[in-house]
């Protein structure tokens, strides 16, 4: 159906006392992203013309963390209830737009459910998201008459009969801007809490003969709020289980779905295998037949076809061409690039360095600010000395170079194609093509020498 223009209000003013944290509750993360950012993203994906964020506690921290240009910051200086929060945002509502009300601590609400709610909203009425619970204690009850929604009664204000109702209010609703402003102006705080309840607009709408349509979410987790870290951890597990299920159904082999963590977006090819306790962060692309070993962390990287990343390897902001092998216990830092068939072994660290086709750095090596050609062998214990305490310098190694173990390359330095660096060499000057570079202290030998003995 054709929808009106729509703006979203996100309530995010609560202190989050039960989190026992200096951080505003809505900035605590789920899947590596602030809870409120999940809600903002849903609003934007839904096509919100404006997103009004009602804040109070920790406003400076919120503004530092949330940089969305579509946000309109609305201060709620006193926390006097949900209705009061909406009253602060009301001056920004256009009469001819719909207003959708969301919560910064309800992070798993889906765009699909919100779109169904938006589509179901009757002309001049209210769309309301509700669920039925076996134990509705503490929640506002949905009252009905002949099947039609007539109002919402908060638990503390409900009669014994009303407390038997299992259908409860999730707090998420949508209504026309002009209607919303009119109803908000009529709210009172004549209740047990002494607060202004947004839920009272349901009864006001019913009294005007307006229709209220209730919609149910696809999953209960979509409307579960977070008040403490235990609830947050449970929603994290729900979210991760859902992501793992999607990946399994799409053909990714997760060896243990309960021990897989997605904190971003994963794009993948066919026949990908991911072992236990792997963390995917940011935007990650895995090609066909990629294998990732246990305990790896992959962040904002592109991994080519047929690559294998062995256990406990950390990869961040990296590009790997096809058929590369990494690890175990390797660290590829931002700017590392491996061309086809390159190999980085255990305890090798790379940063802002390119390793050419078929080149190998097998173990115990640091490669920083380096450009390494094809078919190069980097021996164990090799270090590119790229930093003088103030500036970084580059090391360039041509194709077919052999670098012996325990070599230090003091940048800036260039090693020509086909050169050989003898083990234990400190390279301080450029090395020509096909040359042998060797710098060692002459070996001496003392016959019959005895080691010192400790005195007893």
From Swiss-Prot:
Catalytic residue positions: 363
PROSITE patterns named in the record: HEXAPEP_TRANSFERASES (PS00101)
Residue segments, region N-acetyltransferase: 251-456
Subunit (UniProt): Homotrimer.
Organism: Shigella boydii serotype 18 (strain CDC 3083-94 / BS512)
Keyword entries, A-Z: Acyltransferase, Cell shape, Cell wall biogenesis/degradation, Cytoplasm, Magnesium, Metal-binding, Multifunctional enzyme, Nucleotidyltransferase, Peptidoglycan synthesis, Repeat, Transferase
Subcellular location: Cytoplasm
CC cofactor note: Binds 1 Mg(2+) ion per subunit.
Primary location class: cytoplasm
Gene Ontology CC annotation, any one: cytoplasm
Catalytic activity: alpha-D-glucosamine 1-phosphate + acetyl-CoA = N-acetyl-alpha-D-glucosamine 1-phosphate + CoA + H(+); N-acetyl-alpha-D-glucosamine 1-phosphate + UTP + H(+) = UDP-N-acetyl-alpha-D-glucosamine + diphosphate
Designated name of the protein: Bifunctional protein GlmU
Catalytic activity, EC: 2.7.7.23, 2.3.1.157
């Amino acid at each position: 159906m054709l929808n009106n223009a729509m703006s979203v209000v996100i309530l995010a003013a609560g202190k989050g006392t039960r989190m026992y944290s200096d951080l505003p509750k809505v900035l605590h993360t789920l899947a590596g992203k602030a809870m409120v950012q999940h809600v903002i993203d849903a609003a934007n994906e839904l096509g919100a013309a404006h997103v009004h964020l009602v804040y109070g506690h920790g406003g400076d921290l919120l503004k530092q963390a949330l940089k969305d240009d579509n946000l309109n910051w609305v201060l709620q200086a006193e926390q006097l209830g949900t209705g009061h929060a909406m009253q602060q945002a009301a001056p920004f509502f256009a009469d001819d737009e719909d207003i959708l009300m969301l919560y910064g601590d309800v992070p798993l609400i889906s765009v699909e459910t919100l779109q169904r709610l938006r589509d179901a909203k009757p002309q001049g009425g209210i769309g309301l998201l509700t669920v039925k619970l076996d134990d509705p204690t503490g929640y506002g009850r949905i009252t009905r008459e002949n099947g039609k929604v007539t109002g919402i009664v908060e638990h503390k204000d409900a009669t014994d009969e009303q407390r038997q109702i299992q259908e409860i209010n999730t707090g998420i609703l949508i209504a026309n801007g002009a209607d919303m402003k009119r109803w908000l102006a009529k709210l009172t705080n004549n209740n047990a809490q002494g607060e202004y309840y947004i839920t009272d607009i349901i009864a006001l709408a019913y009294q005007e003969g307006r229709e209220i349509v209730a919609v149910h979410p696809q999953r209960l987790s979509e409307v579960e709020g977070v008040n403490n870290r235990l609830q947050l951890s449970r929603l994290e597990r729900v979210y991760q289980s859902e992501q793992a299920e999607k990946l399994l159904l799409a053909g990714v082999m997760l060896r243990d779905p309960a021990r897989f963590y997605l904190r971003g977006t994963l794009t993948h090819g066919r026949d990908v295998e991911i072992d236990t306790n792997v963390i995917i962060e940011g935007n990650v692309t895995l090609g066909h037949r990629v294998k990732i070993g246990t305990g790896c962390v992959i962040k904002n990287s592109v991994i080519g076809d047929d690559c294998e990343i062995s256990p406990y390897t950390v990869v961040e902001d990296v590009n790997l061409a096809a058929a590369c092998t990494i690890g175990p216990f390797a660290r590829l830092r931002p700017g590392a690039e491996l061309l086809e068939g390159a190999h980085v072994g255990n305890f090798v660290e790379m940063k802002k360095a390119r390793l050419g086709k078929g080149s190998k750095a097998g173990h115990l090596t640091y490669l920083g600010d380096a450009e390494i050609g094809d078919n190069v062998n980097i021996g164990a214990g090799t270090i590119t000395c790229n930093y003088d305490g103030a500036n970084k310098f580059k090391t360039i190694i041509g194709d077919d170079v052999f670098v012996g173990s325990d070599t230090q390359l003091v940048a800036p330095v260039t090693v020509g194609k086909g050169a050989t660096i003898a083990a234990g060499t400190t390279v301080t000057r450029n090395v020509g093509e096909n040359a042998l570079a060797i710098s060692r202290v002459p070996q001496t030998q003392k016959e019959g020498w005895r080691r010192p003995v400790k005195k007893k």
